[in-house]
Amino acid sequence: MKKNSAILLLDDGRKFIGKSFGFIGETIGEVCFNTGMTGYQEILTDPSYCKQIVTMTSPHIGNYGINEEDVESKKIQVSGFIIKEETLIPSNWRSAASIGDYLTKNKIVGIQQIDTRALTRHIRDNGAMNGIISSLDSNIKSLSGKLKKAPSMNGLDLAKNVSTKKVYQWSSKGKYNVAAIDYGIKHNILKLLADNNCKITVFPAKTTAEEIIEFNPQGVFLSNGPGDPAAVAYGIEMVKELLGKKPIFGICLGHQILSLALGAKTFKLKFGHRGINHPVKNMNSGIVEITSQNHGFAVDLNSLPKNVKSTHINLNDNTSAGIELSLIHI
């Protein structure tokens, strides 16, 4: 390959030629897009993006650099990163590094100087699909062979890969004693729970219902996370056993696992919801709320049991954004 050049090859054969960005190497993942103009550091470190190559639709990325505070986990979680153009000289009083240096240091492969609008439209029209970025190999046949071996996101349990392996306490003070199940939990979610007077103990994804009952929390929180919710069988079974015994609140993957435990079904969205301005209608109040979202699967509204109420709807595609079963505090 030419010096500093890179290629993105999609599973359907579409290719994009650009420049290397970050670490020199090769990476495979599901190619998706995020429509946020800011928040790239949070996106890079969000465990929900495990095994995904993220495309930023905003054309200029890295303006305010990288700092030590705006992380959602202890490391970069994405498999790769795609942008139109990198900011070479970031400007912010908290900035400690450029985004390119940050990716290089953490050995994350990226590509820039491609038509990200065309890529986004291709994903929008054809759906999220696997792709490979390489700054080492430009042979299409070779890259295609590697790509065909990559698993589909359907049926993939990734929660166990990103979850904590040990129980730990996030906050020791608070009125409400909460057990948070870590399927890929973000730091900001833990901070928000703590800010709302919750004493939080974080448990691994494969924690059993017996362990939660023994801990005896006042409520159980099911976190966000990557992969197919239907593949997290251990999580679904754990929630089934807790239904009616403890108040349960789920977000993102946790919301989907909770819905599956209640008897609903989930399905893969064509290209997912990833951005910071998704309109969601609160069906109780009629108010439209602007939300930040990051998920590739959704709950099938038609599969909800009769006793489960749909409380929130995504107005972009009329998919489920919230459910409630008030009789057992769900």
Could you say what each language-model-derived stretch is?
Residues 181, 203, 269, 313, ...:
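Hydrophobic residues at beta-strand termini and immediately following loops
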Residues 109, 199-201, 265, 290, ...:
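Conserved beta-strand segments of alpha/beta enzyme cores
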